[in-house]
C-alpha cells in the first residue's frame, strides 16, 4: 500500500504512548529533529505491514513492492514523497507532499479537508522506521515497516513482529514484501543509465 494512501486512509490516536514500548524495542512520541529529518531524506523500501481492516490488507496484497524517496523541506516543514510501486507487471509512479509535527513525532496528510496522522517510530539502529495507525481501534489498527535496504535482517524482522504483538495484533496478520517481484528497480536503473549516456553525448559532440 502506498505510504501516502496509508496516511490518507488511517488516522492515529496516541494509545501506544500509554503502553510500555520497551518490550518491542521501540520509542513512541519522540520529537522530530532536523537530524531525524536529514536521516529520513533518503530512499526507502516498504518491507511489510499488519492491518486489521480487510480492504487495507487487500490493497497491500495487490501491490507487490514499493520504494520511495523522501526529501524534507525545513522551511515549510513538509516532506516530498516520490514513490514507485509494482502492481502486477506494471510500475506505477506517484508523488505527493506530507506534513510533519516536530513536537509529537507525527506525519500528516491533508486530503479532502481532513488531516490524518501517523506516529513515526524510528529504528535508527536497523536503518528503518515504523508508522503506527488507529491503535485505539481493534478493528482498524495497523503498523507498517520501512527500511533503507530491501534485504531484511532477521533482527529487524523480529523487532517488527514483537511490535505488532505489542499493539494487540498477531504475527499471522503481517504481510511481508517479496522483493523478487519488484519491477520498478530495473526501470529506475535503466533510466539512470540513460540519463548518464545523454549527458555524455553533448560532451562527445564538442570533443
Curated annotation (Swiss-Prot):
Cysteine pairs bridged by disulfides in the record: 91-184
GO CC terms, sorted: extracellular space
Keyword tags: Acute phase, Disulfide bond, Glycoprotein, Secreted, Signal, Transport
Gene: Orm8
UniProt signal peptide: 1-18
GO biological process, one term: acute-phase response
Glycosylation sites noted in the Swiss-Prot or TrEMBL record: 25, 34, 76, 94, 104
Additional facts recorded: Eight genes coding for different forms of alpha-1-AGP are present in mus carolis.
Top-level taxon of the source organism: Eukaryota
Localisation: Secreted
Gene3D superfamilies with a match to the protein in the record: 2.40.128.20
UniProt key word Heme: no
Stated role: Functions as a transport protein in the blood stream. Binds various ligands in the interior of its beta-barrel domain. Appears to function in modulating the activity of the immune system during the acute-phase reaction.
Tissue expression notes: Expressed by the liver and secreted in plasma.
UniProt free text on domains: Contains a beta-barrel that binds various ligands in its interior.
Organism for this UniProt entry: Mus caroli (Ryukyu mouse)
Protein name as it appears in the record: Alpha-1-acid glycoprotein 8
Similarity-based family: Belongs to the calycin superfamily. Lipocalin family.
Principal location: secreted
Amino acid at each position: 500500500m502506498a505510504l501516502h494512501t496509508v496516511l490518507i486512509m488511517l488516522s492515529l490516536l496516541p494509545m501506544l504512548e500509554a503502553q510500555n514500548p520497551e518490550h518491542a524495542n521501540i520509542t513512541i512520541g519522540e520529537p522530530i529533529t532536523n537530524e531525524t529529518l536529514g536521516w529520513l531524506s533518503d530512499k526507502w523500501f516498504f518491507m511489510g505491514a499488519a492491518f486489521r481492516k480487510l480492504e487495507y490488507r487487500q490493497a497491500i496484497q495487490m501491490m507487490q513492492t514499493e520504494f520511495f524517496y523522501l526529501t524534507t523541506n525545513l522551511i515549510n516543514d513538509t516532506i516530498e514523497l516520490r514513490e514507485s510501486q509494482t502492481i502486477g507487471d506494471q510500475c506505477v509512479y506517484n508523488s505527493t507532499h506530507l506534513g510533519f509535527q516536530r513536537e509529537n513525532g507525527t506525519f500528516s496528510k491533508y486530503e479532502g479537508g481532513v488531516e490524518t496522522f501517523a506516529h513515526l517510530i524510528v529504528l535508527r539502529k536497523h536503518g528503518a522506521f515504523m508508522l503506527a495507525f488507529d491503535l485505539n481501534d481493534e478493528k482498524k489498527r495497523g503498523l507498517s515497516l520501512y527500511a533503507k535496504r530491501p534485504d531484511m535482517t532477521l533482527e529487524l524482522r523480529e523487532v517488527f513482529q514483537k511490535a505488532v504483538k505489542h499493539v494487540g495484533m498477531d504475527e499471522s496478520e503481517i504481510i511481508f514484501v517479496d522483493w523478487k517481484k519488484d519491477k520498478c528497480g530495473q526501470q529506475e536503473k535503466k533510466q539512470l543509465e540513460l540519463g548518464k549516456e545523454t549527458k555524455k553525448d553533448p560532451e562527445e559532440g564538442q570533443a
